[in-house]
């Protein structure tokens, strides 16, 4: 509503007719959302990102939810986009969690129809890598492992070294491999990931499982070259 005065927008927003999503971007509240006076992000995210003229994909727990592996419905909505960061006020819309990377791995995105058009989200393998790499946005590695446990039946890392690994870090692959191997006992998937990793890089160095704790005196996992400096516990599904 670019031609509306701010006073008019405030009035119809307070009446529950429109919902303020972003500075200058409002969504008309459909009748079936009128009681809550808000609209879920999946309803407007594609239109919002078009308005911002930025590429995106639905990521982390919300992508996992689309894959049927969220365990619990996420309280926030994670959107992956590219730098530079958008100036989004948390007070304007605190349901959106913005995560940024250098480029969007379009070859590893899936699409589906929503109420208002088409939305884009990460495929299972990219989702798995993202929830490990950006675990600070979802509550840590134990939460990531719980999601991975539900996602394993959809994971297929054959050929990942050709292109997918270029969108993440070696450390992320190591941590994901360790979790699949030692925490989730998903040996077949872990073996495939390991073969892809060793074909991608000839050698890799030891890293801590988490950067939030010291690695002194931590046990070593020789296969994935991990300092096991934290305990990962998955929730019961």
Which residue ranges define each predicted feature?
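Short gly/ser-rich loop at a beta-strand->alpha-helix junction or flexible surface loop bordering the NTP-binding
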Residues: 17-104
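Hydrophobic alpha-helical interaction segments
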Residues: 109-237
């Amino acid at each position: 509503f670019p031609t509306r005065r701010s006073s008019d927008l405030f009035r119809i927003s307070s009446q529950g007719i429109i919902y303020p999503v972003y500075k200058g971007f409002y969504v008309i509240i459909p009748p079936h959302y009128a009681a809550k006076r808000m609209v879920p992000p999946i309803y407007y995210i594609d239109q919002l990102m078009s308005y911002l003229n930025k590429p995106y994909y639905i990521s982390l727990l919300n992508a996992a939810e689309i894959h049927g592996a969220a365990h619990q419905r996420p309280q926030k909505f994670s959107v992956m986009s590219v730098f530079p960061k958008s100036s989004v006020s948390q007070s304007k819309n605190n349901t959106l969690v913005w995560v940024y990377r250098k480029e969007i791995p379009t070859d590893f995105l899936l699409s589906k129809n929503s109420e208002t058009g088409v939305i884009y989200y990460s495929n299972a393998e990219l989702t798995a890598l993202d929830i490990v790499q950006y675990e600070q946005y979802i509550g840590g590695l134990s939460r990531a492992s719980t999601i991975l446990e539900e996602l394993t039946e959809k994971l297929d890392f054959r050929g990942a070294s050709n292109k997918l690994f270029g969108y993440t870090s070696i450390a992320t692959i190591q941590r994901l491999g360790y979790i699949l191997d030692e925490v989730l006992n998903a040996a077949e998937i872990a073996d495939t990931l390991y073969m892809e990793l060793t074909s991608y890089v000839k050698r890799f160095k030891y890293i801590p499982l988490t950067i939030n704790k010291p690695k002194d005196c931590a046990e070593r996992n020789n296969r994935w070259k991990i300092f096991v400096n934290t305990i990962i516990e998955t929730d019961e599904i």
